[in-house]
Amino acid sequence: MLLLVLLFVFISATNASDVGRRELEKHFDVGDSSLDSVGDVLLKLKKLAHQRAFGNREFGHDAEEDSKKPVAISVLQPTVAKDVSPYLFEGDIFLSKKQAINILKEVSGIESKSKPNVRGRRSFDASPESKWPTTAPIKYRFHESIDFYAVSNIIKAIRYWENVTCLEFENSPDVADNEDFIEFFQGQGCYSMIGRNGGRQGVSIGENCVKAGVIEHEIGHAIGMWHEQSRPDAQSYIKVESDFILPSYVSDFLQRDKDIDTLGLPYDLGSVMHYGSTAFSVDQSSKTLITRDPLYQSTIGQRETLSFLDIETINKAYCSDRCSGSNDCKNGGYPHPKQCDTCLCPNGLSGPKCEDFEPPRKAECGGKIVVKEEWQSIESPGFPDPGYDPDQKCNWVFEVAGKRIEFEFIEEFSFLCTSTCVDYVEMKISADLRPTGFRWCCFNIPKGSFVSELNIAVIIFRSQLTNDVGFKLQARATDLPARTTPAPVVITTTPVPTTIEGTDQWAEWGSWSQCSRSCGGCGIMSRVRVCRTKQCKGRRQEFSTCNLKACPIDKHCAKLLANDKICNGRVCTKASQALSGCLEPQCCPPFINVDGTCQSDSPLLNDFELAK
């Protein structure tokens, strides 16, 4: 039986790899032997990590089951294409043969035995040969498979990298094949190599990969950046929930010591290079990464744009010799490597020395506020009605002399609800204003008060996709000690992965995951258990409904009903029927609102347990 399962996995991987191999050979300077080596090393790495996590459980069976499920590293990034996945590390990295072997050696402990004192703190490739030269532009060209819309967005992403770093790129359609260059092509998904590897080096911008932050992410790989959560210090900021990872993908959550260099920069949970909270999830909703500080949970996985520390990573790696003299920039800013008399400022800050607020976008809002002992309030555009509009941004800088600043959310609170916030309010109250702050969205108002570490803080409002109510926040000067008031983190205890004799012996169920929705009945949560024997009957994972309280009344409902009154015809009648109940607390189908609680007797719920 084991032989048949392994044979199935081999045949499936072979069929997928035939298509994937042709794509990789066409757009990268790699041959059959290199591809075979990379594929073999990644398979060994997967088996090694699987054995460490699950003991003697059959890898082949898990790999077969996992191959049927979609995989993504962030909800804001497309799923990994199965044809190329056997050759990709961490979902979107095509390793060189040397890189793959080095990672396997490090993870298996071979290097640590021969070099026990070697250790680093890393997020940028440490190999000197992996850096592109700064004496000439990085050449690139577009393959004919790239459509005009993708070309336009790639050019915008390249220009943004150029605007904030010392790097220069040059479109060279006639670049010689023996030169080093990047080739953008429409492949199966979004992926890239790490750093400069020589010759033609592809960056796949596949279908649904054209969002600015996704393209910037893949270019980041091409110029030397690894994923943020691969740093050896990542466990101080995140916890990996192995119970909820697709078992054959646990190797994609390894922390490594020797491949890359952090250049002394702090960990950034808002990096565009960070996994999302449901990366490689068994059900695309259970969280595989839990932030140690739960206030950052909705920050990780963003694909809006480069974070300030993403930019500083490249500037430290490539541009540290561009500006001499002292750094007069304030609040974590530093001289722009192309204009040394200008400061690059952390998100939300601006001005000659980074002491002012960043100008607003498509709204009249923001400002620099001198905090007093009495409460002062700010609010998002249009709060609470008609609410904010898409693609707006506001920035406030709060300052006080000799005291700290206390913040508290008041009145109403509502944003587009996503696991990684797309529309959000962000709070930066730490002593270091460079890293991304806490980001909140959805419908639950943050409870309690928050106190800054120093006498300055930054609040950022950002909308990208929708209109909604937004937020209102009040602030005052205080002598209270710095604090946040996060809800406790629910840490899942991973069952011991020891394989024992016999059959059908399960470990205890793990803890329930967080609910995927805050109200309305359509949220789910799940938990898993580990088979202690080689085979077990029954379900490895079970699901439960959760948060059955009806959602609040939509603040835009009255506006929609008013618009509907001027509409006539059959289409408008259907719209009127759909809107007729929007002045009542809402439940998701198949639930109905019964005295404020969402209830249903639908057979669809037969597969769901009731969590206790």
Swiss-Prot record:
The active site is at E218. Glycans are attached at N15, N163. Residues 320-355 form the EGF-like domain. Residues 1-16 form the signal peptide. Residues 365-478 form the CUB domain. GO terms for cellular component: extracellular region. The keyword Hydrolase applies. Keywords: Cleavage on pair of basic residues, Disulfide bond, EGF-like domain, Glycoprotein, Hydrolase, Metal-binding, Metalloprotease, Protease, Secreted, Signal, Zinc, Zymogen. Its cofactor is Zn(2+). Gene3D superfamilies: Collagenase (Catalytic Domain), Spermadhesin, CUB domain, Thrombospondin type-1 (TSP1) repeat. One of its GO terms (biological process) is molting cycle, collagen and cuticulin-based cuticle. GO terms for molecular function: metalloendopeptidase activity; zinc ion binding. Inhibited by 1,10-phenanthroline. Disulfide bonds join C166-C319, C190-C209, C329-C343, C345-C354, C365-C394, C515-C546, C519-C551, C531-C536. It comes from the Eukaryota. Zn(2+) binds at H217, H221, H227. Binds 1 zinc ion per subunit. Residues 503-552 form the TSP type-1 domain. Its EC number is 3.4.24.-. Residues 123-320 form the Peptidase M12A domain. It is found in: Secreted. Pfam families: Astacin, CUB, TSP_1. Its main location: secreted. This is Zinc metalloproteinase nas-36.
